[in-house]
UniProtKB/Swiss-Prot annotation:
Record protein name field: ATP synthase subunit delta
GO CC term, one of those recorded: plasma membrane
Function: F(1)F(0) ATP synthase produces ATP from ADP in the presence of a proton or sodium gradient. F-type ATPases consist of two structural domains, F(1) containing the extramembraneous catalytic core and F(0) containing the membrane proton channel, linked together by a central stalk and a peripheral stalk. During catalysis, ATP synthesis in the catalytic domain of F(1) is coupled via a rotary mechanism of the central stalk subunits to proton translocation.
UniProt cross-references to PANTHER family, sorted A to Z: ATP SYNTHASE DELTA CHAIN
Record gene name: atpH
NCBIfam families: PRK13430.1
Chief localisation class: membrane
Organism: Bifidobacterium longum (strain NCC 2705)
Annotated membrane topology: Peripheral membrane protein
Listed PROSITE patterns: ATPASE_DELTA (PS00389)
Subunit annotation: F-type ATPases have 2 components, F(1) - the catalytic core - and F(0) - the membrane proton channel. F(1) has five subunits: alpha(3), beta(3), gamma(1), delta(1), epsilon(1). F(0) has three main subunits: a(1), b(2) and c(10-14). The alpha and beta chains form an alternating ring which encloses part of the gamma chain. F(1) is attached to F(0) by a central stalk formed by the gamma and epsilon chains, while a peripheral stalk is formed by the delta and b chains.
Keyword list, A-Z: ATP synthesis, Cell membrane, CF(1), Hydrogen ion transport, Ion transport, Membrane, Transport
Amino acid sequence: MRGEASRIADRESRDSLAPKLRDTREDAWRIGNELFTITKVLDDSIQLERALTDPSRPVADKVAVLKELLGDNAHPMTMEIMTDLVSRRWSRARDIANAVEDFGVDAMMYYADATDATLQVSIELSELHSALLNLPVVRAKLYDYQATSEARVKLFREVFSGKTLNKVTMRLAEHATCNLRRRRYLETIQWLINKFSRHMGESMVTVTTATPLKKEQIKRLVEVYSAKVGRQVHINSVVDPTVLGGMRIQVGDEVTDNTVVAQLQNLHRKVQTEATPA
């Protein structure tokens, strides 16, 4: 968990630079890729992270380190983002890499906006999450620390070679397995789904069922939960064959479990409570 100083630094930096990053439009693709590369470099070097976050070191020295790291090939916006980040105070050295990754995802979302692909990417990430839920062996290999990042990316491409995914979906999915960042693969995909949902100004409603939802069911769920939360919602449909009947619905931290298993568990608890002597 990030400390207070890091949370403030991340939020203020992204808020202040969001308009400029958004205005880069299709250049945001290049910027996002550069930021993902920098995230990996930082993750691989605690010494570099410390050099860029040392509060006793002048900002000018940190910028000099950045210029040596990035050279003359980085997009000006990438350099501006990194300069802003190294000028801020961080709770822990490694938190700066988290902020760089956040900016990278932001850039990819702005590129999706510029190419009218935001909703498509959000849906594809949800479908990817659902598909991998039923592929435990593949899922485990996608966050196997013993395998090289190249091997994990190659596996992802082989498994999903038959799907025509948007380039943003592909890049985000590959980033998630290329640079694991101490996360399970599906955790990262769910994190990305949530970020896209917030970016689109919607609430994410995750619905888990044994079989895929029909279009009519999704439409009805959108109507019901949009009215309930007071704003448009996006349905994240998850297929889990182990679910026995009914639906498990999650909105934020609130879970409504109407599956057969949940109802049996509730009945069992009720019977036990009633059977307990007063």
